[in-house]
Design a protein with these regions (language model features):
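Mobile genetic element proteins and their domesticated derivatives, centered on retroelements
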Residues: 3, 18, 34, 38, ...
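Acidic/histidine-rich, metal-coordinating catalytic segments
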Residues: 117, 124-140, 159-162, 214-217
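C-terminal domain-tail junction helix/linker
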Residues: 63, 148-150, 173-260
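Basic, flexible linker segments flanking DNA-binding modules
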Residues: 1-70, 136, 159-162, 215-225
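Mobile-element integrase/transposase regions
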Residues: 28, 32-92, 98, 110-116, ...
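RNase H-like polynucleotidyl transferase catalytic core
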Residues: 48-52, 129-134, 148-167, 183-188
């Protein structure tokens, strides 16, 4: 019964992710049994129609080893029930897979992107590198000047090769499948509220297969602890501290950047 209820609540989750959720709730259930019931009750996720993707050799960047080493940005488009279209700026930490921001508005310029990044940085600290496509917002004078003044490296993927920004491609697919295709947005404030709730759920509750089924938040906390222990061991052998303990980059609070 709980499996069916959870599958109804998480309609786009497969049996593996549902099994993780059940175990987290304290249900001692075998994964094969979950799979069998999942099939018998016809809870299987229905495949959506595919879309054309740019062809070409995948050239993924090296996997970052710490939070804030690399963020990636992208846009997703949707529309409200009255037909008005809006865009969503997605900001992802490529190491922890945390969604740092979902910014929804009818217009998102390069200057607006810069303001939203500044707001995230105030909460989380500055990234070493940001990855994006070559959209006009990301190649605007506002973004170029910001990257130069902050010292953040900005890496542009090859034109027509969205797969080179694989972290955002994967995240945007989950966002589309689990939320946007399932929700009717009545207004922009409604869309922002729903996106915020989903972002928090994604970071704090949703198990991630690439993180050993940990949530992005739990993985970030575990990784931060490992980095802290390593730094303590190094610091014990050093003449002086190697890093400022008040460095704001150690703050891993998540933030949703919203339009006022």
């Amino acid at each position: 019964d709980r499996l069916k209820a959870l599958a109804q609540e998480r309609r786009r989750f497969g049996y593996r992710r549902l099994h993780v959720m059940l175990r987290r709730e304290g249900h001692a259930v075998n994964k094969k049994r979950v799979q069998r019931i999942y099939r018998e009750e016809q809870l299987t996720v229905r495949r959506r129609g595919g879309r054309k993707r740019a062809m070409g050799t995948r050239r993924p960047l090296d996997l970052p080893l710490a939070p804030n080493q690399r963020w990636s940005l992208d846009f997703v488009a949707d529309q409200m029930t009255d037909g008005r279209r809006f865009r969503i700026l997605t900001v992802i930490d490529n190491c922890t897979r945390e969604c740092l921001a979902l910014v929804a508005d009818t217009s998102l310029s390069g200057a607006r992107v810069v303001r939203e990044l500044d707001a995230v940085i105030r909460q989380r600290g500055r990234p070493d590198t940001i990855v994006s496509d070559n959209g006009t917002e990301y190649t605007s004078n506002a973004v170029l000047a910001w990257a130069d003044s902050t010292g953040v490296g900005w890496h542009y993927i090859a034109p027509g090769k969205p797969q080179q920004n694989g972290f955002n491609e994967s995240f945007n697919g989950r966002l589309r499948d689990e939320l946007l295709n399932e929700t009717l947005f009545r207004s922009l404030p409604h869309a922002r509220a729903v996106l915020e709730a989903w972002r928090r759920d994604y970071n704090e509750r949703r198990p991630h297969s690439k993180l050993g089924w940990l949530t992005p938040q739990a993985y970030a906390e575990a990784l931060t602890g490992q980095i802290g222990r390593s730094a303590a061991l190094v610091g014990g052998c050093a003449d002086r501290p190697l890093a400022n303990p008040d460095n704001p980059s150690s703050d891993h609070q998540r933030t949703l950047v919203m339009a006022g």
